[in-house]
């Protein structure tokens, strides 16, 4: 027996887990931005060190010139790669704003129809220009039938974050759509958006319909505060999406905070019975030029970053919880389980 054959016959927990995930239908990528996938260029690499907020504006250069066809090719390439990497469904945020107007959402709808049941694609509106100013608000409202999930980014309506979330919740109550909101992305204790989102979920009676995407800054707070927020999240039945490789690159700071990795505190969330799913976030763009969307990489980083070694819990996170948070829970009974 060769050395390679000997190694292949040994127990490999990651390989065993991946095979099990595949037997349960494959990975679910619960948060991505396929419309911007593979847009990185050598020139853009100069801007990859910019602050997140600066990148929000920088991508206007691409959006302003991208046609429906350009967007479709990005989304199609991303989905084909996801299929190759054994991901079987995804939720992609898609820009709808005065810069790109409806080009990205039109392309996403074409891709949705093109792949059909081969790759169920759930579309969420990305609100990079906020939801409160008249023009962005009008564009989103007029496209309400074209996407399945209301996406939010409260930081884009700075100083009016509560109003931003209120508007999302009002739309959700009118349409019955789920809500996914980017919160606490700066890994800093000055942010308390997860708490705000949970409280607003309860206030609007949308328990079980809202998902917090990222919630990094939660881990930067003292344990007493985290425990308080977890209780509110339980009352709100708030779910979460963790995108490990998207945020592990947060720069070092001199702030004194509890020791933690720059990851969603998934270990603490699951211990308290909160639903957590996994996503890739950006793929080969100015935000994450080296991220390829491979969910096995995301799984590995989650396992080691949060020290979650329970294969049953990990299976739930990458498959079952994924279908639940992107609104495809009805597909769970169709999965082939062994």
Residue ranges and their predicted role:
Residues 12, 104-113, 133-239, 256-278, ...:
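Histidine/acidic residue-rich metal-binding segments in metalloenzymes
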Residues 14, 57-73, 122-134, 153-158:
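Active-site mouth loops of central-metabolism enzymes
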Residues 28-35, 182-184, 214, 281:
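Histidine-centered divalent metal-coordination motifs
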Residues 96-98, 125-131, 156-158, 185-189, ...:
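Active-site-proximal loop/turn and secondary-structure-junction residues that shape catalytic pockets
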Residues 199-210, 246, 250, 260-338:
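His/Asp/Glu-enriched, well-ordered alpha-helical/loop segment
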């Amino acid at each position: 027996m060769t050395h390679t054959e000997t190694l292949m016959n040994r127990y490999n927990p990651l390989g065993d887990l991946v095979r099990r995930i595949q037997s349960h239908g494959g990975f679910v990528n619960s948060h991505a931005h396929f419309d911007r996938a593979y847009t990185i260029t050598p020139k853009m690499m100069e801007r990859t060190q910019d602050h997140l907020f600066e990148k929000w504006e920088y991508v206007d250069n691409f959006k302003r010139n991208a046609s429906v066809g350009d967007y479709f090719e990005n989304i199609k390439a991303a989905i084909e790669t996801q299929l190759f990497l054994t991901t079987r469904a995804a939720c992609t945020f898609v820009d709808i704003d005065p810069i790109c107007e409806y080009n990205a959402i039109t392309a996403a709808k074409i891709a949705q129809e093109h792949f059909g049941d081969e790759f169920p694609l759930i579309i969420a509106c990305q609100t990079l220009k906020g939801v409160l100013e008249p023009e962005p608000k009008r564009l989103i409202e007029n496209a309400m039938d074209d996407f399945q999930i209301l996406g939010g980014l409260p930081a884009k309506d700075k100083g009016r974050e509560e109003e931003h979330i209120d508007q999302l919740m009002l739309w959700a109550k009118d349409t019955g759509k789920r809500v996914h909101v980017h919160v606490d992305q700066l890994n800093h204790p000055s942010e308390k958006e997860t708490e705000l989102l949970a409280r607003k979920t309860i206030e609007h009676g949308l328990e079980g319909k809202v998902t917090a995407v990222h919630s990094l800054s939660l881990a930067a707070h003292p344990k007493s505060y985290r425990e308080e927020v977890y209780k509110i999240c339980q009352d709100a039945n708030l779910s979460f999406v963790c995108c490990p490789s998207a945020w592990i690159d947060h720069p070092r700071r001199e702030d004194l905070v509890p020791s933690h990795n720059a990851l969603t505190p998934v270990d603490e969330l699951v211990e308290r019975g909160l639903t957590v799913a996994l996503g890739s976030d950006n793929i080969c763009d100015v935000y994450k030029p080296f991220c390829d969307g491979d969910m096995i990489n995301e799984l590995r980083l989650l396992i080691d970053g949060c020290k979650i070694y329970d294969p049953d819990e990990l299976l739930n996170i990458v498959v079952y919880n994924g279908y639940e948070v992107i609104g495809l829970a009805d597909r769970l009974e169709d999965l082939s389980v062994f």
